[in-house]
Structures are given as structure tokens and as C-alpha cells.
């Protein structure tokens, strides 16, 4: 009996030892695989209330606007730029109504440690970007690379990683956005609490304000069943220094400026928000929200995580 007990105890010890060895082996294997993930921290500036990073195009440093409101990446061609232009040329109209030829170009692109050949739509270097940036990095780049990015204006950096678990321990608020069927851009919901909500709001870091409502969405809120609640949110609008009701304050292009007492976006409440309504194709949540916290974007999973400042 004692012999059997000793064997049983010894067997349990060996089983535990074997289990520990298996765990160590699996952990080591995972660590090796995990170490193959790429991560880089890239300096980011917040210019004109928009996120800007530097990248290399064919070895030449260029400044790119990180724009979630653009489905394509765009390169502005300057004098002396030497790129291999490919594809059919497209005639388009610039900001001054002049017609220009454009198309797309292939270039060696390097953002931190992430490099490879990438297609860019090219445009003549004109006033489309007001001469402020050399190009745009759109949602196509995030989806094509399969990376997760963290835009952190407070710390002044952009973290780009293929490690999907890198930010798991950070306290964050998750929003699953809807991908537009036409341009695949991120659309989400914004609440005016109280006072209703607006669906299909474009999350657009290439828009340097906080909130822009389509005039149709604005009018619908004003005349909805909760229209009175929404109107109470409007703490008085000012256009050209005048006070009055929101519907009265319009300029020649149909813009209405107003201020919201409270708004909920990316699962976060924000207060005293300057906003406006305008005749435009989409309601937009803009890059000004990056002043209130960092944003993590996982484009392939259609997730946006918001990390409010101070939490």
C-alpha cells in the first residue's frame, strides 16, 4: 500500500512537472512569435487641429496628414518630384475651378519601421491641401497594412503596431463603427443628450473642428419629437458676434453655428461643444476630439477605442 501511495504521489509530481514544462514551452513559443510583431513610435504634431506625421517617399521626407475621412492616400506632386507615374490620368477640378490631370503613382513608402511599395493617388501641388501638407494617409493604408494605430496628441506620438494585444491593458472605451458601403469610411453615432442622436457620422481626423452636422440632420433634430430638448442644448449661437436662435444665424453658404451643452461621442461625454450645421455630404466628428483623449483605431475589426485624458 505504501508503495502504491509513493507511486501515486510521485506520479502526481511528475504530472505537475510535465504540465509546468509544457506551459514554459508554450510561453517561450508564444514569446518568440510575439517578438516578431512590429511596433514603432513615431513623432506626431497636431497642426491646425489635425494629426501630422513624417514619412519617407522614395527616401525623401514628406509630411502627411493622418486622415480617417479619406478612403485613399494622396500625394501632392511638387516641382522636381521624380515618381513613376502609373495608371490612367484623370481630369479633375482644383479649388479654383481649374482643371488638372491626375492619376496614381507607385512609390516606396516608409513610416517608421513599416515600409513597402504603396499606391498613391497623385494631384498637382495646388491649394487642395492649402500647401500645408505633402500628402494624406487615408483609411486604405490602415486596412492594407493590417496595423493598429494609437493617435496620442497629448504625448505627441503615433504608435503603429501589428501586435493586436499591445493596448489590451489600457483603460479604454470601445466603439464599433459601421463601414460605409461606398467608400469604406468609419461611420458612428453621436448623441445629443438629451435631444436625440445622429447616425452615420463620419469620424474624420482630416476635419479640424469638433462637430459638423449636415443641414438635413440638424433640421431633423430641430423638428423631431425631442426638438425642444435639442433646442435647449443650444446655449445661444454666434455668427459674426450676434446672438440669436440657431436657425436665424446663417451665412451665405447656409452655415449655422451653435454650442451644445452636452454631447456623447466615442462612449464619452463632452461639454460646451462648439459645432455648426452646413450643407455638406456627411455629418462629421472631427479631430478636435483628440484634444480630449487618445484614439486607438483597429481598421480591420472596425473598432475605435477612446482613452479620455485624466482617466
Which residues does each predicted region cover?
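Pepsin/retropepsin-fold aspartyl endopeptidases
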Residues: 35-311
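Bacterial N-terminal signal peptides
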Residues: 18-29
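Generic recognition of cysteine residues
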Residues: 15, 20, 110-113
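N-terminal secretory signal peptides that target proteins for export/translocation
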Residues: 1-15
Amino acid at each position: 500500500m505504501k508503495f502504491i501511495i509513493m507511486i501515486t504521489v510521485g506520479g502526481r509530481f511528475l504530472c505537475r512537472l510535465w504540465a509546468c514544462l509544457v506551459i514554459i514551452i508554450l510561453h517561450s513559443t508564444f514569446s518568440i512569435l510575439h517578438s516578431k510583431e512590429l511596433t514603432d513610435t513615431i513623432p506626431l504634431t497636431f497642426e491646425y487641429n489635425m494629426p501630422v506625421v513624417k514619412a519617407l517617399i522614395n527616401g525623401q521626407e514628406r509630411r502627411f496628414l493622418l486622415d480617417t475621412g479619406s478612403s485613399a492616400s494622396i500625394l501632392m506632386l511638387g516641382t522636381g518630384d521624380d515618381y513613376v507615374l502609373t495608371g490612367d490620368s484623370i481630369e479633375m477640378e482644383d479649388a479654383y475651378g481649374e482643371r488638372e490631370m491626375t492619376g496614381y503613382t507607385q512609390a516606396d513608402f516608409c513610416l517608421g519601421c513599416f515600409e513597402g511599395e504603396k499606391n498613391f493617388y497623385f494631384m498637382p501641388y495646388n491649394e487642395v491641401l492649402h500647401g500645408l501638407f505633402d500628402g494624406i494617409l487615408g483609411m486604405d493604408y490602415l486596412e492594407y497594412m493590417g496595423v493598429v494605430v494609437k493617435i496620442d496628441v497629448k504625448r505627441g506620438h503615433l504608435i503603429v503596431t501589428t501586435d493586436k494585444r499591445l493596448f489590451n491593458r489600457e483603460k479604454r472605451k470601445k466603439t464599433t463603427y459601421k463601414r460605409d458601403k461606398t467608400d469604406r469610411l468609419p461611420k458612428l453615432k453621436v448623441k445629443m443628450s438629451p435631444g436625440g442622436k445622429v447616425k452615420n457620422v463620419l469620424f474624420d481626423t482630416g476635419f479640424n473642428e469638433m462637430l459638423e452636422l449636415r443641414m438635413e440632420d440638424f433640421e431633423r433634430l430641430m423638428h423631431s419629437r425631442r426638438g425642444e430638448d435639442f433646442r435647449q442644448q443650444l446655449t445661444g449661437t454666434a455668427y459674426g458676434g450676434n446672438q440669436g436662435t440657431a436657425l436665424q444665424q446663417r451665412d451665405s453658404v447656409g452655415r449655422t453655428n451653435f454650442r451644445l451643452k452636452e454631447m456623447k461621442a466615442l462612449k464619452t461625454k463632452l461639454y460646451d461643444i462648439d459645432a455648426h450645421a452646413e450643407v455638406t455630404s456627411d455629418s462629421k466628428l472631427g479631430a478636435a476630439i483628440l484634444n480630449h483623449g487618445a484614439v486607438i483605431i483597429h481598421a480591420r475589426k472596425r473598432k475605435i477605442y477612446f482613452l479620455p485624458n485624466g482617466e
